[in-house]
Structures are given as structure tokens and as C-alpha cells.
């Protein structure tokens, strides 16, 4: 059985002011695909991901998404309400008995934070370092049941152990 097509971009263009950031970009993303977008700073990689995620609309062209495709994006800016706890950001309204016994969630937290202790879930977003904020964003995406995960500079602020864990987890 062929992989399910998740999203298509056809002749997508976007400009900011007088400068074209994307010019007639066409691509398709299928379930199970792993791709990298490379280019120099300011070349439009982040903008392309925002269009794929539906966060930004192109000036021209068409974006077609599978109706059931669940898409998440980790942008370059790690943001959450400063008073939100790690548990609020990552787990949302899930009941503790639902997530605490889930081996996948335990593995993600242990891999990204080194443990699965309650104190991690109680820390506020404002109290976290840059690397910890990045780990929170990654944990949220990896725990959510998504079909497509877009990672924009995912290793920014991560230490060597975090980069190694993420690389092995995404295989």
C-alpha cells in the first residue's frame, strides 16, 4: 500500500515587501517521509514550514492538505505563557493517570529531561533555560499524535545529549 499523501504545495510564492522569499515552490509530503530543508540564512526555510503548517498563507499558489492530517510545528521561538507549567504546556488537559503510565510519554520525558519526576511538570515556563524551553516544545510535539512534525532548528539550545537523543528518537 502506498504511503498516504499528507500535503501538497503547487507553485507557492510569497513575498515580504519587494523581496520574494518563495518563488513557485512545489512539493508533496507523504506519510513516513523524512526530509530536510537546507539553505542559507533568510532563504525562506522557516517561511516554507509555516506555509506547510498552515500558520501562514502564500501570496500565490495552492496548498492542499489531507483532511485528516494532524500537523505540528516547532518554530525557532519557544513560546508559552510564562506562568504555564511544563505539565500544562506538554500534557494539556490529559489526566495524570492517563499519561503517567504511558511508556511512550515516559520515554520521551526521560530522553529529553533525564527523568520522569513530578518536579519537572511543576516548573513554570518562565523559570526554564533556553535548552529546557526547547525540550518542552519538542516533548509536546512528540507526545501529541501528529501525522507531520515540522522542526525548525530543533537542536538550537540543546546540549550534546539532547541532540543525540533526538536524532535516535526520530529515526
Predicted segments, located by residue:
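ABC ATP-binding cassette signature C-motif
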Residues: 1-171
